[in-house]
Regions:
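Extended alpha-helical targeting/anchoring segments
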Residues: 2-571
Length: 571
């Protein structure tokens, strides 16, 4: 790796301009950028800034993230088959966040804030107050309160979505009990996971792969009367320290996976759950219910090595590595929960799955059979209608559109059918409202949503935890981008005798656990003519990409050190 540490880059804006931007009678979030020109790659930067090196930033590794995104482009299929239905995705951005200033956790209806930078005490309120309808605050009200009410200054106008600070984290599927199921009398099960956990991030390393630029973006909040020149000096020092960190990062020496045990649940039990879900459909309770199952693996795993393996073998529109103290979320999700850019709301329902073939010809044959399957088409159309209804809840009347319908997207082990639903956000709504309107995705619950969630609660033996929720961000400007947590794994590290992560699914203590617990989960949409064995096989295919990435670093840990770019998902 080529390094060019010499020279002294400058923080923009300069000291006096920064102070001028910060001047005012209200808290202000002021944007400043620092160019990073040392030839660093995203994985290397994450490793350095998350404290993996001996000279890492103190405590930064407890909360850090790596998010990588991709854009749609026209298909490059040389044969033109299914064009324009077949599309691929290519990388645009990578984001590395480190050293957050607060952590907000919502659990059992209570929001707590861990203030990591004393200057943010009092700026964040996870109590949430009352919701818009006067009811007690829910998880989204609490997250809204975790984003300080501050004027944005120094932010450029731009025509695309970009994370340059704000709230980053996950909203677990189990938040449905707070948002929906408590109202219909469904008891919340015991869970090892919070409903939500987000960091307030003010330091983001932004990689623009299309432009070849790497910048460290600061978005600190300054109070009225605060010494802005002193804060600027601190940012310069922090920028130079971070630049020095990444410039001295050695080639990655990532670990692998040493498995000690694995449990997958009973195939017969899952197929019985499918039959019971089918009975609900035939009885008219639901049109569809998404029933999931999990695999639990135990052993010692390096999350960064795992992510690198998944990134290379299963590149996807949403790649993420979230390190939250003793819980890490690693994933390669193909599906948007909701995206908000300015006043545009976007949902991308994915429904319809078939395996990849042995080559382009078989890929096209299998995709054609999927598109011609009446069951797949009916299921997809139903979920597109559900997405339209979700978006309509927060959109201006008459603005909801289906922009793309039944595109085929290719991934490492499967092909999916995707559509795009858009709407214009109503003037009195924000990103948190949009998240609430679309959460959980109908593709992870079924339809109608509330009754389908009740069926899922009755049929699945363990709480879903993070699976089926959302992972992503709400930026300072109100933009948001959250992926559905699928094709993902949670890694729970031993937390000691008092650690919450040492609690088993049945609520018993697991104080002797000294290895990581890795949970991989997948589901299938159950309708009237579902065949239990086929639905089980679909969950196996959906888990395959994540399990293969683990097995790859188990067989050969050194292979995970390859820092391959996020290439097109259809390769």
């Amino acid at each position: 790796m080529t390094r060019h540490p010499e020279g002294r880059p400058s923080l923009r804006p300069d000291r006096e301009s920064f102070a001028s931007l910060a001047d005012g009678d209200r808290p202000a979030v002021v944007r400043a950028t620092f160019p990073i020109d040392v030839g660093v790659e995203p994985l290397e930067a994450y490793a350095a800034l998350a404290g993996r090196t001996t000279e890492g930033i103190p405590d930064a590794g407890e909360y850090a993230f790596l998010l990588e995104s991709a854009e749609k482009v026209p298909s490059s299929d040389p044969d033109g088959a299914f064009a324009p239905e077949t599309v691929e995705r290519h990388a645009r951005y990578s984001f590395v966040g480190f050293d957050p200033v607060t952590v907000v956790t919502v659990e059992d209806g209570t929001g707590t804030v861990d203030v990591l930078d004393h200057r943010y005490a009092g700026l964040v309120d996870a109590d949430g107050g009352a919701g818009d309808d006067g009811d007690a605050a829910d998880v989204l009200d609490r997250l809204r309160g975790a984003l300080p009410d501050a004027e944005r200054r120094g932010f450029p106008d731009r025509d695309r979505q970009l994370l340059d600070g704000g709230l980053v984290g996950f909203l677990a599927y189990d938040a449905v009990y707070d948002l929906h199921l408590d109202e219909v009398g469904v008891d919340r099960p015991a869970s090892r996971f919070p409903d939500a956990e987000f960091v307030l991030n003010t330091k983001t390393l932004v990689f623009d792969h299309a432009q070849g630029d790497v910048s460290l973006v600061f978005t600190p909040v300054l109070r009225p009367g605060e010494d802005a020149r002193k804060r600027h000096d601190e940012l310069v020092a922090a920028a130079e320290r971070a630049r020095d960190q990444v410039s001295r990062a050695d080639d990655l020496a990532m670990g692998g996976f040493e498995r000690t045990s694995e449990t997958a649940g009973s195939k017969a039990a899952y197929e019985d759950a499918v039959r019971r879900a089918t009975e609900h459909v035939l009885d008219g309770d639901v049109y569809q219910a998404v029933v999931s199952r999990e695999r639990e693996l135990r052993g010692e795993v390096d999350p960064l090595g795992f992510y690198a393996s998944l990134r290379e073998t299963n590149p996807s529109p949403y790649m993420y590595l979230l390190a939250h103290d003793d819980l890490t979320v690693v994933g390669a999700s193909p599906e948007t929960l909701v995206s908000v850019r300015g006043d545009e709301v976007v949902a991308n329902p994915i429904a319809g799955t078939c395996p990849r073939g042995n080559g382009p010809v078989e890929d096209r044959r299998l995709a054609g059979e999927m598109l011609a399957d009446d069951k797949e088409r009916a299921e997809h159309t139903m979920l597109v209608d559900l997405a339209r209804n979700d978006v309509r809840r927060v959109a201006k009347p008459g603005t909801v559109r289906v922009e793309e319908f039944m595109n085929v997207l290719k991934y490492s082990h499967v092909q999916h059918v995707e559509s795009t639903v858009t709407g214009t956000l109503a003037d009195d709504r924000d990103a948190f409202d949009a998240i609430g309107a679309t959460f959980p995705a109908g593709t992870l619950s079924g339809a109608p949503k509330i009754r389908a969630m009740e069926v899922v609660d009755a049929l699945e033996p363990t709480p879903r935890g993070v699976y089926g929720g959302g992972v992503g961000y709400v930026a300072w400007n109100g933009d948001a981008d959250l992926a559905i947590v699928i094709r993902s794994a949670t890694i729970e590290t031993p937390a000691g005798d008092e650690g919450d992560r040492n609690v088993e699914p049945d609520g018993t203590d697991d104080e002797d656990r000294t290895v990581d617990r890795i949970i991989v989960r997948a589901g299938a949409g159950i309708v009237a003519d579902s065949v239990p064995e086929r639905e089980y096989e679909e969950t196996e295919r959906k888990m395959a990409g994540v399990l293969d990435a683990l097995e790859r670093i188990e067989r050969d840990p050194d292979r995970s050190a390859a820092d391959a770019p996020v290439e097109e998902a259809g390769r």
